[in-house]
């Protein structure tokens, strides 16, 4: 392996680790809402997250992936196949006709990783489908397009699956997502599945897109939870989730980032690499064993129009949890700020 290949592989490990951390945060946040606020509130939160993502990303994504000239049912299903494949999600696509195309997420489910799936109510999983899949026809300007769900993993079935169907008539709101548990998807043939053009999707672009896929969920979830539950409750839920995930994931993330357990010195070095791996610029100064980290803005949230200072609880919770995973008694403090573009000044130790 050449030096350039070595460096690329190291960068890829770091990006993958950042993706795993943000992926865990998003899944953990849903479970935190389930356990602290109940199923109904969790379902409303998940619905709002996926509806916002659908409204912001579906149509631009169709164009970016070269799917915008396909029939509506086929375009919608292929979008889910390709966009999720980029993020490392297990996904299958099966074409039947121009008016009927299947999408299937076989086990293990990406979003409900590991044992998390045992804590996800069916209503919360359905909210995801209501938020995104049921609204694709509306986005495409074709009110005849609906989604028929035939299986849900969280209900004990062997995957989440269903098909987009273009009916002969416009659908009412409650007809855009229906369930048909007596049906089953046809077999998946990878040889007939759509593929990304290699020229416009080279490996480095795919690697970065893999990282961004997971981070985008947190980018959406943080402002949504503030709008749904208010800044005080949202800050608590984001902070608690961050602490729990940070404590659980420090060793795993540190291994990929070249970090280790220790004291404030080791944790400051770890944070420097973490900032670099998520495209944030940070300057670190040390004085008598204490570190000040000046984070030059938060790139993930820089273009979020409804950013609220409570969103920063994502970082305060994560960093406190990661510090606890690194070693005992490593205090982490963030000086208050009020805008996504303002520098964040952290004190460590």
Residue spans of the language-model regions?
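N-terminal accessory segment detector
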Residues: 1-102, 109-127, 138, 142-159, ...
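Long, well-ordered alpha-helical scaffolding segments within enzyme catalytic domains
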Residues: 127-133
């Amino acid at each position: 392996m050449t030096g350039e290949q070595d460096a690329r592989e190291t960068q890829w490990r770091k990006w993958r680790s950042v993706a795993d951390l943000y992926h865990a945060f998003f899944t953990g946040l849903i479970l935190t809402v389930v356990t602290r606020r109940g199923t109904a509130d969790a379902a409303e939160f998940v619905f709002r997250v996926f509806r916002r993502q659908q409204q912001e990303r579906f149509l631009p994504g169709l164009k970016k992936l070269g799917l915008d000239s396909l029939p509506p049912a086929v375009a919608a299903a292929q979008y889910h196949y390709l966009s999720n494949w980029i993020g490392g999600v297990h996904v299958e696509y099966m074409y039947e006709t121009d008016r009927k195309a299947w999408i299937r997420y076989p086990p293990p489910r990406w979003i409900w990783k590991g044992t998390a799936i045992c804590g996800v109510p069916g209503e919360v999983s359905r909210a995801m489908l209501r938020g995104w899949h049921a609204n694709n026809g509306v986005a495409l300007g074709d009110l005849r397009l609906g989604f028929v769900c035939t299986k849900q993993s969280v209900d004990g079935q062997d995957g989440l699956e269903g098909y987009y169907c273009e009916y002969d008539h416009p659908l009412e709101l409650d007809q855009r997502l229906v369930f048909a548990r007596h049906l089953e998807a046809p077999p998946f043939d990878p040889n007939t599945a759509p593929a990304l053009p290699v020229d416009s999707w080279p490996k480095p672009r795919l690697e970065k897109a893999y990282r961004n896929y997971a981070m985008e969920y947190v980018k959406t979830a943080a402002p949504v939870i503030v709008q749904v539950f208010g800044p005080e409750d949202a800050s608590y839920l984001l902070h608690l989730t961050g602490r729990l995930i940070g404590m659980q994931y420090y060793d795993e993330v540190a291994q990929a980032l070249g970090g280790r357990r220790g004291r404030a010195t080791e944790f400051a070095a770890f944070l420097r690499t973490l900032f670099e791996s998520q495209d944030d610029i940070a300057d670190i100064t040390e004085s008598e064993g204490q570190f000040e980290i000046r984070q030059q803005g938060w790139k993930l949230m820089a273009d979020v129009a409804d950013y609220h200072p409570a969103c920063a609880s994502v970082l305060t919770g994560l960093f406190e949890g990661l510090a606890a995973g690194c070693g005992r008694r490593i205090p982490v403090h963030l000086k208050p700020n009020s805008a996504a573009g303002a520098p964040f000044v952290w004190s460590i130790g």
